[in-house]
Design a protein with these regions (language model features):
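Non-catalytic, glycine-rich low-complexity segments
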Residues: 1-34, 107-129
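Carbohydrate-binding surface patches
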Residues: 15, 25-27, 521-558
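C-terminal beta-strand-rich structural cap/linker in extracellular carbohydrate-active enzymes
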Residues: 32, 82, 572-587
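The substrate-binding groove and active-site-proximal loops of carbohydrate-active enzymes
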Residues: 162-176, 208-221, 295-309, 326-335, ...
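Active-site-proximal helices and loops of the catalytic beta/alpha 8
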Residues: 229-237, 247-263, 321, 331-419, ...
Length: 587
């Protein structure tokens, strides 16, 4: 019997979306191993063709998790208005899914089946093509460099007379330091930079912004940044900057005016939750105004206020137009007014059509990825599932598969291709440090780098845009903020993984399967075996890994050819040793 409770289809969602004019992707969920076939029937929703004369497509099972199988079909036709229904069959019965009704009888009328009203160009699911092809190097400016292959590790505070505030640093990194090390970044294979905040701010992290129109003097000048952008573009690379529009510094001109003038301030409606008189609390005191978290120095902006919106729309345009940056990573995006983001997107795309907008949202982001706000989000879910499988070893490959499939099917596939996958960032512990936390390590740290290597392999071969935090290639570690934002160890790498990164990035960028190919899981077990394929119409790449501290000889699905990259692989027995991997190219 077909398990009716497991059947799911949601129209106009990640289960039914357009990828081009006259092209639709349709998905269906069913119980594990329940259906023996699934057929999609589709036709023109505005003509009179009988429903039993509809065109048909056999749906492919594209993924399975612990409970469900997922089927998919791609409609490439001459239709821009489509209606459709599903025919499902197991050994005992045939059922039809028609507009959320499961029936044993054939549907009789178009009003009884699913509708895709019209494939509108502006609603086609996609991201700028260059984002799919990007391999991102994320730089925390204060920590990276102030010279070629060097950083002073010296705080160089600066008193800004115009603002009347001291601007702090911790390690002394500069824009000039980034310019002088572009050869290093390019040599590793990265083709996109993402910089944490560079605008004028009081603290070294620069998430408490004082001036949105200038580079922080501690980092350099506006002209230094123009030079950086020019140098990046001359190498065929892209550059993304950090935008902090959820909150500002408590010495930002508008909030400073509120403190000074109270209810008479023309900016009193620029901020959330003000109680007059507004005072700046002492350290340890909770503010009486709304902030980012409870950070007293970061009052929350009222982004639904038209004046606030207009101010930051100009900031958006200014950096895209005057400095020619290629996109924005947008801080605390899920706390900002959604109409603000819709307006922001309109300005960004009008100013620079292929600019990208990446939201900092740590959870499910369906609501923000409908094509009216963001192109992408920072995919912390990728980090979490890799942490639990590779670093902690607390889930097996079956559980890893289930969570990975959920992540991959959460959005339309073109949106998944642009998700910013990461293992660490300025906000979380270094992944290599997490690899010391597995119970199986137990004082034996010989597996730490092997676990880290497998995670990087997964990052650079999976669907999505990989992002690497500066210094991961040199073994930077750290659980606490001051440690995971450590100075770049130019002279004394903790662990030199540059060859690994070069090899994997070169493989990714030279093989279209990793950029535009689909993703199919081929095999997994209850231990550490995980095998997947990335494929285009003309080529297929198979990636096999063993995230377990024992050899595994059950890799029967591997191609009968030499791997292009491997570690601890026994070709004769189709076996992978502890933490081994192999990548095969099949033409």
């Amino acid at each position: 019997m077909i398990n009716r409770q497991a059947i799911l289809h949601r129209p106009l969602s990640q289960y039914a979306y357009s990828t081009a004019e006259y092209c639709l992707t349709i998905r269906l969920r069913a119980a594990n191993n329940n259906l023996c076939s699934c057929v999609l029937h589709y036709g023109n929703r505005v003509d009179l063709t009988p429903l039993d004369k509809f065109r048909t497509l056999k749906m492919e099972k594209i993924a399975s998790d612990d409970y469900f199988d997922y089927y998919e079909a791609n409609i490439n036709s001459d239709l821009d208005r489509v209606c459709y229904y599903f025919e499902m069959q197991d050994a005992d019965e045939r059922l039809y899914l028609c507009a959320d009704t499961i029936a044993t009888d054939f549907p009789e009328d178009r009003t009884e089946v699913y509708q895709f009203p019209f494939i509108r160009r502006e609603e086609i699911s996609d991201v700028p093509h260059w984002l799919k092809e990007a391999v991102v190097y994320n730089i925390f400016p204060d920590s990276f460099a102030d010279s070629k292959r060097g950083i002073s590790c010296t705080a160089k505070d600066y008193f800004d007379e115009k603002i009347g505030q001291t601007l702090h640093t911790r390690l002394g990194g500069t824009i000039r330091g980034i310019i002088e090390n572009l050869d290093y970044i390019e040599d590793l294979g990265f083709n996109c930079l993402y910089l944490n905040p560079i605008f004028t701010a009081a603290e070294y992290h620069r998430y408490d912004l004082l001036d949105y129109y200038h580079v922080c003097p501690n980092l350099g000048t506006d002209d230094d940044f123009r030079e950086l952008v020019s140098e990046v573009h001359s190498r065929g690379m892209h550059i993304i900057i950090d935008g902090v529009f959820n909150h500002s510094s408590w010495y930002f001109f508008a909030f400073d005016d509120v403190v000074k003038n109270g209810e008479n301030s023309r900016y009193k409606d620029w901020f959330y939750g003000l109680k007059f008189p507004v005072v700046r609390p002492e350290d340890g005191q909770r503010p009486i105004y709304t902030c980012f978290a409870y950070e007293r120095k970061m009052p929350k902006l009222n982004t639904s206020n038209p004046e606030v919106r207009d101010y930051f729309m100009d900031v958006c345009r200014y950096w895209l137009e005057d400095f020619d940056v290629d996109g924005w990573r947008l801080d605390v995006a899920n706390e900002v007014d959604k109409d603000f983001w819709r307006a922001f997107r309109a300005v960004a795309k009008k100013t620079k059509k292929d600019s990208v907008l990446i939201a900092e949202i740590w959870e499910n982001s369906e609501r923000w990825l409908q094509g009216d706000m963001f192109d992408s989000t920072m995919n912390y879910e990728f980090r979490k599932v890799c942490r639990d499988f590779f670093a902690f070893g607390k889930i097996n490959a079956r559980e890893f598969n289930s969570r990975f499939v959920d992540m991959l099917l959460r959005y339309p596939f073109p949106i998944v291709q642009g998700q910013l996958n990461l293992l660490d960032s300025h906000d979380v512990s270094r992944f290599r440090s997490l690899c010391t936390q597995s119970p199986s390590v137990a004082g034996d740290f010989s597996t730490v780098d092997k676990r880290f290597r497998l995670a990087e392999l997964c990052l650079l071969t999976s669907v999505g845009t990989p992002s690497v935090f500066y210094g991961d290639e040199l073994g930077v570690v750290g659980f606490e903020e001051c440690d995971y934002r450590a100075p770049m160890p130019w002279a004394n790498p903790v662990k030199d993984n540059r060859d690994l990164f070069r090899e994997l990035i070169k493989l990714r960028r030279s093989n279209d399967c990793f950029i535009h190919g689909n993703f199919r899981v081929l095999d997994y077990d209850e231990r550490g075996k995980f095998v997947f394929a990335r494929a285009t119409d003309s080529k297929r790449v198979v990636v096999a890994l063993n995230a377990f501290n024992e050899s595994n000889d059950s890799f029967s699905v591997l191609p009968d050819c030499e791997p292009i990259i491997s570690y601890n692989y026994d070709a004769q027995n189709h076996a992978l040793g502890a933490f081994g991997y192999a990548i095969f190219e099949v033409k």
